[in-house]
């Protein structure tokens, strides 16, 4: 690798501010705020609005829209019967 062209890659703590869920990962982002991790070391903290701990898709609280709405509308418009009936 060429020297001096790659960003500094280091461990950081990502903190979901909604649920206070924390995880340690590698990143090129940095922060002046630090926090002590479970291993006793201090790492920079990156605050997140949404993570896998609070996103509706991953938590199972997602609401699904009716997927067959367009098909039903087309069939109704052209007087076709639905296959479901």
From Swiss-Prot:
InterPro entries: Ribosomal_bL28/bL31-like_sf (IPR034704), Ribosomal_bL31 (IPR002150), Ribosomal_bL31_B (IPR027493), Ribosomal_bL31_sf (IPR042105). The keyword Ribonucleoprotein applies. Gene3D superfamilies: Ribosomal protein L31. Pfam families: Ribosomal_L31 (PF01197). One of its GO terms (cellular component) is ribonucleoprotein complex. GO terms for biological process: translation. One of its GO terms (molecular function) is structural constituent of ribosome. The keyword Transcription regulation does not apply. Signal peptide: none annotated. Keywords: Ribonucleoprotein, Ribosomal protein. Part of the 50S ribosomal subunit. Belongs to the bacterial ribosomal protein bL31 family. Type B subfamily. This is Large ribosomal subunit protein bL31B. It comes from Staphylococcus haemolyticus (strain JCSC1435).
């Amino acid at each position: 690798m060429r020297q001096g062209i790659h960003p500094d890659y280091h461990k950081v703590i990502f903190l979901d501010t909604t649920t206070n869920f924390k995880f340690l990962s590698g990143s090129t982002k940095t922060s002046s705020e630090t926090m002590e991790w479970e291993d006793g070391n201090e790492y920079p903290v990156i605050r997140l609005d949404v993570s896998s701990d609070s996103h509706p898709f991953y938590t199972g609280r997602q609401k699904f829209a009716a997927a067959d709405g367009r098909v039903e509308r087309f069939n109704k418009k052209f007087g076709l019967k639905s296959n479901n009936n």
